[in-house]
Amino acid sequence: MQKGIHPDYHLVVFQDSTTGFKFISGSTATSAETVEWEDGNTYPLIRVEITSDSHPFYTGKQKFTKADGAVDRFNKKYGLK
Protein backbone atom coordinates (compact mmCIF):
# COMPACT_ATOMS: atom_id res chain seq x y z
CA MET A 1 0.00 0.00 0.00
CA GLN A 2 1.21 3.47 -0.82
CA LYS A 3 1.57 5.86 2.07
CA GLY A 4 -0.31 9.16 2.13
CA ILE A 5 -3.11 8.30 -0.33
CA HIS A 6 -5.56 6.50 1.95
CA PRO A 7 -8.08 8.29 4.21
CA ASP A 8 -7.63 8.15 7.97
CA TYR A 9 -9.58 5.19 9.39
CA HIS A 10 -10.61 5.67 13.01
CA LEU A 11 -13.39 4.95 15.50
CA VAL A 12 -16.45 7.22 15.39
CA VAL A 13 -19.80 7.23 17.21
CA PHE A 14 -22.94 7.13 15.06
CA GLN A 15 -26.17 8.47 16.59
CA ASP A 16 -29.67 7.80 15.27
CA SER A 17 -31.28 11.25 15.19
CA THR A 18 -34.76 9.73 15.59
CA THR A 19 -34.26 7.38 18.55
CA GLY A 20 -31.02 8.65 20.08
CA PHE A 21 -29.43 5.17 19.78
CA LYS A 22 -25.61 5.34 19.61
CA PHE A 23 -23.03 2.83 18.45
CA ILE A 24 -19.31 2.94 17.79
CA SER A 25 -17.75 1.75 14.55
CA GLY A 26 -14.67 2.25 12.42
CA SER A 27 -15.06 4.78 9.62
CA THR A 28 -13.27 7.35 7.48
CA ALA A 29 -16.03 9.90 8.21
CA THR A 30 -15.10 12.95 10.25
CA SER A 31 -17.08 15.50 12.24
CA ALA A 32 -16.44 18.64 14.26
CA GLU A 33 -18.87 17.33 16.91
CA THR A 34 -17.46 14.98 19.52
CA VAL A 35 -18.94 12.82 22.25
CA GLU A 36 -17.49 10.96 25.22
CA TRP A 37 -18.13 7.22 24.90
CA GLU A 38 -18.68 4.70 27.71
CA ASP A 39 -14.95 3.84 27.77
CA GLY A 40 -14.07 7.44 28.71
CA ASN A 41 -12.53 8.32 25.33
CA THR A 42 -13.77 11.13 23.08
CA TYR A 43 -14.78 10.24 19.51
CA PRO A 44 -16.22 12.19 16.55
CA LEU A 45 -20.04 12.11 16.46
CA ILE A 46 -21.86 11.42 13.18
CA ARG A 47 -25.65 11.93 13.23
CA VAL A 48 -27.64 9.70 10.87
CA GLU A 49 -31.37 9.61 10.10
CA ILE A 50 -31.91 5.84 10.05
CA THR A 51 -30.08 2.98 11.77
CA SER A 52 -30.98 -0.60 12.62
CA ASP A 53 -32.66 0.78 15.77
CA SER A 54 -35.27 2.76 13.80
CA HIS A 55 -35.58 0.97 10.42
CA PRO A 56 -38.79 -1.12 10.17
CA PHE A 57 -36.96 -4.02 8.49
CA TYR A 58 -34.80 -4.55 11.58
CA THR A 59 -37.34 -3.60 14.24
CA GLY A 60 -40.22 -5.64 12.82
CA LYS A 61 -42.63 -2.80 13.47
CA GLN A 62 -43.34 0.66 12.19
CA LYS A 63 -41.95 3.50 14.30
CA PHE A 64 -43.10 7.02 13.66
CA THR A 65 -40.25 9.41 13.21
CA LYS A 66 -40.19 13.00 14.37
CA ALA A 67 -38.70 14.20 11.09
CA ASP A 68 -41.13 15.08 8.30
CA GLY A 69 -40.63 13.67 4.84
CA ALA A 70 -40.22 15.74 1.68
CA VAL A 71 -43.92 15.41 0.80
CA ASP A 72 -45.02 16.56 4.27
CA ARG A 73 -42.71 19.59 4.11
CA PHE A 74 -44.06 20.47 0.65
CA ASN A 75 -47.66 20.20 1.82
CA LYS A 76 -46.97 22.37 4.89
CA LYS A 77 -45.12 24.96 2.82
CA TYR A 78 -47.94 25.38 0.30
CA GLY A 79 -50.85 24.84 2.69
CA LEU A 80 -52.05 21.61 1.12
CA LYS A 81 -54.00 18.97 3.09
From Swiss-Prot:
Keyword Amino-acid biosynthesis appears in the UniProt entry: no
Entry GO terms, CC: ribonucleoprotein complex; ribosome
Alphabetical UniProt keywords: Ribonucleoprotein, Ribosomal protein, Stress response
A GO molecular-function descriptor: structural constituent of ribosome
Pfam families in UniProt: Ribosomal_L31
Induction or repression: In strain DPC2739 is induced in mid-exponential phase cells by exposure to 42 degrees Celsius for one hour.
GO biological process, one term: translation
Transmembrane segments: none
Family recorded in the similarity comment: Belongs to the bacterial ribosomal protein bL31 family. Type B subfamily.
Description of how the protein assembles with itself and partners: Part of the 50S ribosomal subunit.
PANTHER family found in the cross-reference section: 50S RIBOSOMAL PROTEIN L31, CHLOROPLASTIC (PTHR33280), LARGE RIBOSOMAL SUBUNIT PROTEIN BL31C (PTHR33280:SF1)
Annotated protein name in UniProt: Large ribosomal subunit protein bL31B
Source organism of this protein record: Lactiplantibacillus plantarum (strain ATCC BAA-793 / NCIMB 8826 / WCFS1)
